[in-house]
Curated annotation (Swiss-Prot):
Main location: cytoplasm
Family of the protein in this entry: Belongs to the polyribonucleotide nucleotidyltransferase family.
Keyword Nucleotidyltransferase annotated: yes
Cofactor field: Mg(2+)
Annotated Mg(2+) binding sites: 486, 492
Location(s) in or outside the cell: Cytoplasm
Species for this entry: Chlamydia trachomatis serovar A (strain ATCC VR-571B / DSM 19440 / HAR-13)
General function of this protein: Involved in mRNA degradation. Catalyzes the phosphorolysis of single-stranded polyribonucleotides processively in the 3'- to 5'-direction.
UniProt EC number: 2.7.7.8
DNA-binding recorded as keyword: no
Catalysed conversion reaction: RNA(n+1) + phosphate = RNA(n) + a ribonucleoside 5'-diphosphate
KH domain segment(s): 553-612
GO CC, alphabetical: cytosol
Protein name listed in UniProt: Polyribonucleotide nucleotidyltransferase
Length: 695
């Protein structure tokens, strides 16, 4: 392929430049996207499957090369390896944006790789990666139903900003990443400072105008330079197969839908599928293959569930479209934790635990912008027993990381300032039962665990997951969706926030986008559900507890002059190690001179403060100190008046009477009251015990 390029101007100093034909020419599609000095490369390749499967084997991997920012990893291994949390989250953004664009029953193994090759420290690479991955697929042979693009939207100084820079984003009240086609939204994810539903809709509409502009440019470029699409890899569903399967299960599945609990419904559905396979699969007839019959069964189930909702307004568990499942709350739940809550909504349950600690408990991370530490972090655990299965236990999967980060963002906006509450906060959400909306249960349970731990949050936060049934030109929004509704429905729209406004949201679409009107309806219905849940939460725990748990460490802060930081640390950290050893407290010093002292007892904190004040305190001429004799010489004694500060009390200043033998007057280690007479130009202290004696 010859070298080709095109550009899309978004705003001043924000122009997307797409290039192909120079790099990775053996890939099915390869694109280099540039904005200023941030460059992101994306490739798309596909391979034929050795055997047909009933899912789309689509994999996205995004990697930020440290060399792109002129850095190397601070770890022992300098080669990029296991993806970081941020890389996994961006990989998920790309995957969720692109997945709805593929045709149903596409029998290809598809891989998209994205690498950050150059990073200027200003232009954020994730929206470039979404656009680059989409463009790489667009010019490849991989079949797609639509072209997509992605952007980031911020709210800075009351104005919407497209693809905000890193500095703009730090001042923004909104961080929204969204993707869609030229006419509809496919994916959104973001968090914000208590924006209203109307503001979020306005932000989405603002971003959609730029998405349409990018999509139109990619589509025009595809028509001019793209490869022929390989639609032969898409399997058709024979109409008679779908009809036969639908007729076979109609009455039987209607009976299965009468079961209101998840386990009974799943068992009935499993038995029905086995019956369908046993009766309808025909080895001699390829139309009635196992793959086709299973796909037709899934479609028939979905259609029947949808019909129940559309015709009767009743869902599979008997609820109306706006009804929330029964909620029970127990807090505190665990006796020795700093804060805990058992939050149950229907058959979804989260055991949330809050742990408070000092600076050493912060979550360290490393990315293109350097090293950092998270003051607050939420970790989500989804063991296989929560859905009655046997499975792998180990490092978290992409889904666990994504769900945890969404809940973390939802709660981060209500945390107090560090100056008011200096603790490091770790939240964990242990999903002990799951039937949909477990990430939003993590938000609710996590909020209550924070309140139980005595974290003075600004307001309670609740979350709810919304679904969509879109058929017959009719859009039905479902509140608090269950697992089967998530699986067979058209949308998963999670919204979290306070009574005042939204703090986080995430939407995934399985169809080719939804309209502004549907999102408006979903957000309005989500607000009603959120208010209901918040009311139940505040009935159990109206406000955060006034004090932290007796099992939590005590933390106090003190401020010192930045010029004294080196004094407190000492050569090679000697001084601060001595403070920690002598006090039993954990001491952490920030670059701004703020010192955090954490200990299990108040006595340890007081001892550490005393030692630090001694090191950083300034001696005053004329002041009397109760010092300690550190050494004795023939001409006088050296007395430590403050930790690390010694002065000389000459033999003539020891007493009003003549002292012949100093050792007869005072011993090393004795306490001795001395008055500071003067400080010479070298900083040496002249002390007098005689001056403290009464006439």
């Amino acid at each position: 392929m010859a070298f080709e390029t095109f550009s899309v101007a978004l705003d001043k100093d924000k122009t997307l430049i797409f290039e192909t034909g120079k790099i990775a020419r053996q890939a099915s599609g390869a694109i280099l996207v540039k904005m200023n000095e941030t460059w992101v490369f994306s490739s798309a390749c596909a391979a034929s499957l050795s055997e047909a499967v009933d899912f789309l084997p689509f994999r996205v991997d995004y990697q930020e090369k440290f060399s792109s920012a002129g850095r190397t990893s601070g770890g022992f291994l300098k080669r990029e390896g296991r993806p970081s949390e941020r890389e996994i989250l961006v990989s998920r953004l790309i995957d969720r944006s692109l997945r709805p664009s593929f045709p149903n029953r596409l029998m290809q193994d598809i891989q998209v790789l994205s690498y950050v090759w150059s990073y200027d420290g200003k232009t954020l690479p994730d929206p470039l990666a979404i656009c680059g991955a989409s463009a790489a697929l667009a010019i490849s042979e991989v079949p797609q139903n639509c072209i997509i693009a992605g952007v980031r939207v911020g709210l800075v100084g009351g104005k919407w900003v497209i693809n905000p820079t890193r500095d703009e984003l730090s001042a923004s009240k909104l961080d929204l990443v969204m993707a869609g086609t030229a006419s509809a939204v496919l994916m959104i994810e973001g968090h914000c400072d208590f924006l209203t539903e109307e503001q979020v809709l306005e932000a989405i509409a603002f971003g959609q105008t730029y998405i349409a502009k990018i999509c139109d440019a990619i589509e025009a470029w595809q028509k001019a330079t793209g490869k022929q699409k390989n639609f032969s890899a898409v399997l058709d569903m024979p109409e008679d197969v779908q009809n036969v399967v639908s007729d076979f299960i109609r009455e039987k599945f209607e009976k299965a839908l009468s079961f209101r609990d998840k386990e009974a419904l799943e068992q009935a559905s499993k038995e029905l599928e086995e019956s369908v396979i046993a009766n309808l699969v025909q080895e001699e007839n390829s139309d009635f293959s196992l793959l086709n019959v299973k796909a037709a069964f899934k479609t028939a189930k979905s259609n029947q569930m949808r019909a129940l909702i559309q015709d009767l307004g009743i869902r599979v568990d008997g609820r109306t479209t706006t009804e929330i499942r029964p909620i029970s709350i127990e807090t505190p739940f665990l006796p020795r934790t700093h804060g805990s809550c058992l939050f149950t909504r229907g058959e979804t349950q989260s055991m949330a635990v809050c742990t408070l600690g000092g600076e050493n408990m912060a979550q360290r991370f490393e990315d293109l912008n350097g090293d950092g530490a998270a003051r607050f972090y939420l970790q989500y655990f989804f063991p296989p027993f929560s859905v009655g299965e046997v499975g792998r236990i180990g490092s978290p999967g992409r889904r666990e990381i994504g769900h945890g980060k969404l809940a973390e963002k939802a709660l981060s906006h209500v945390l107090p300032e560090t100056s008011r509450f200096p603790y490091i906060i770790r939240l964990e959400s242990n999903i002990t039962e799951s039937n949909g909306s477990s990430s939003m249960a993590s938000v609710c349970g996590g909020c209550l665990a924070l309140m139980d731990a005595g974290v003075p949050i600004k307001a309670p936060v609740a979350g709810i997951a919304m679904g969509l049934i879109l058929d017959r030109d009719q859009a039905i929004i479902l509140s608090d969706i269950s697992g089967i509704e998530d699986h067979l429905g058209d949308m998963d729209f999670k919204v979290a926030g306070t009574a005042k406004g939204i703090t986080a949201f995430q939407m995934d679409i399985k169809i080719e986008g939804i309209t502004h009107k549907i999102m408006e309806q979903a957000l309005a219905q989500a607000k009603q559900g959120r208010s209901h849940i918040l009311n139940l939460m505040t009935q159990v725990l109206a406000s955060p507890k006034g004090t932290v748990s007796k099992y939590a460490p005590r933390i106090e802060t003190m401020q010192i002059n930045t010029s004294k930081i080196a004094t407190v640390i000492g050569p090679g950290g000697k001084q601060i190690r001595q403070i920690i050893e002598r006090s039993g407290a954990q001491v952490d010093i920030n670059d701004d001179g703020v010192i955090n002292i954490a200990a299990s007892t108040q006595e340890s904190i007081n001892k550490a403060k005393e030692l630090i004040e001694g090191l950083t305190g300034e001696v005053e001429v004329g002041k009397v100190y109760n010092g300690r004799v550190t050494s004795i010489a023939t001409f006088g004694v050296f007395v430590e008046v403050l930790p690390g500060k010694e002065g000389l009390c000459h033999i003539s200043e020891l007493s009003k009477q003549k002292v012949d033998n100093i050792s007869d007057f005072v011993k090393e280690g004795d306490k001795l009251a001395v008055k500071l007479l003067s400080i010479n130009e070298k900083g040496q202290l002249k002390l007098s015990h005689k001056a403290t004696l009464e006439d």
